[in-house]
């Protein structure tokens, strides 16, 4: 009798490298490949267990002396925007969001390059080429979409890609319990629009419409100013050694509150 078994995923550990968020710290990651017929199922399980996806890799911090990286997810069905978030929604009332298959475009890369050059000149992604970007978008074995955010132009109708300037884009995985924001970027010259906040609010709206509970934001690092924005979206849960627990925002410094 022939019995077929599904191979278990193999996990690997990276060598130590400088932490991009906390000075004087070293980071290590544990990772596995998301390929094959069970890739989407594994992505769900691993994301719910604190992993993040990058291309066909799922990874999680495995640092020897630091536990600062904390997985964060918004409780979408309970979420209500704050006054400042309502102002962000109003400021972007002229924006059309359209969902597409995970396929790159030269227009996307041009905006992505502009974002990196302004926001992440020293980061690990700073030298990404157009081919690197295409791989980031296309190399997925799960249910991945790219959402484009464009300024509405008169005459925009039912065409496949609405007219208007591309302001922002988000690479997003649809999972059994919600949406996971894999990577997002925007025009850094339009600071008054708070496009990063707007994209998160749009993902909460989409998750609510799907009747699903969670929007996964990746890792929050207390002490890293570039991560502070994630705690403004309440209520939310943080993954602790005891599992997912509701986060108390009153424990944060005032600067991170609305």
UniProtKB/Swiss-Prot annotation:
Where's it found, cell-wise?
Cytoplasm
Any one annotated GO CC term: cytoplasm
* InterPro entries reported for this sequence: Acyl_CoA_acyltransferase, Asp_Glu_LeuTrfase, N-end_Aminoacyl_Trfase, N-end_Aminoacyl_Trfase_C, N-end_Aminoacyl_Trfase_N
> What EC number(s) has UniProt assigned to this enzyme?
2.3.2.29
* Enzymatic reactions: N-terminal L-glutamyl-[protein] + L-leucyl-tRNA(Leu) = N-terminal L-leucyl-L-glutamyl-[protein] + tRNA(Leu) + H(+); N-terminal L-aspartyl-[protein] + L-leucyl-tRNA(Leu) = N-terminal L-leucyl-L-aspartyl-[protein] + tRNA(Leu) + H(+)
- All disulfide bonds of the chain are none
Q: Chief location of this protein?
A: cytoplasm
Arranged from A to Z, the UniProt key words for this protein are: Acyltransferase, Cytoplasm, Transferase
Question: Which terms under GO biological process does the entry name?
Answer: ubiquitin-dependent protein catabolic process via the N-end rule pathway
SUPFAM superfamilies per UniProt: Acyl-CoA N-acyltransferases (Nat)
Q: Which residues form the signal peptide?
A: none
Keyword presence, Zinc = no
Q: Out of the domains of life, which is the source?
A: Bacteria
Could you say which protein family the record assigns here? Belongs to the R-transferase family. Bpt subfamily.
What NCBIfam families would the database entry show?
A: PRK01305.1-3, PRK01305.1-4, PRK01305.2-3
Write out the function statement from the record.
Functions in the N-end rule pathway of protein degradation where it conjugates Leu from its aminoacyl-tRNA to the N-termini of proteins containing an N-terminal aspartate or glutamate.
- Please state what the protein is called: Aspartate/glutamate leucyltransferase
What is the taxonomic lineage of the source species?
A: Bacteria, Pseudomonadati, Pseudomonadota, Alphaproteobacteria, Hyphomicrobiales
């Amino acid at each position: 009798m022939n019995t077929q078994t599904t191979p278990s995923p193999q996990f690997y550990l990276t060598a130590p490298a400088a932490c991009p968020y906390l000075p004087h710290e070293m980071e290590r990651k544990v990772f596995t490949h998301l390929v094959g017929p069970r890739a989407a199922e594994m992505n769900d399980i691993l994301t719910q267990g604190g992993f993040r996806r990058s291309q066909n890799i799922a990874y999680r911090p495995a640092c020897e002396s630091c536990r600062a990286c904390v997985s964060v997810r918004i409780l979408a069905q309970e979420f209500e925007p704050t006054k400042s978030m309502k102002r962000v929604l109003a400021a972007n009332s002229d924006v059309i969001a359209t969902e597409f298959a995970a396929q790159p475009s030269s227009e996307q890369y041009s905006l992505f390059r502009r974002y990196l050059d302004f926001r992440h000149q020293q980061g690990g992604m700073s030298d990404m080429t157009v081919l690197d970007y295409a791989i980031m978008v296309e190399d997925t074995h799960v249910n991945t979409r790219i959402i484009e955010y464009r300024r509405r132009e008169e005459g925009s109708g039912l065409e496949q890609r609405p007219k208007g300037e591309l302001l922002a884009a988000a690479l997003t995985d649809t999972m059994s319990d919600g949406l996971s924001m894999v990577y997002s970027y925007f025009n850094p010259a339009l600071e008054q629009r708070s496009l990063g906040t707007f994209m998160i609010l749009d993902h909460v709206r989409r998750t609510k419409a799907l009747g699903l509970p969670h929007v996964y934001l990746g890792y929050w690092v207390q002490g890293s100013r570039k991560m502070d924005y994630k705690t403004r979206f309440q209520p939310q849960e943080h993954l602790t050694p005891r599992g997912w627990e509701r986060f108390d925002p009153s424990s944060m410094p005032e600067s991170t509150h609305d």
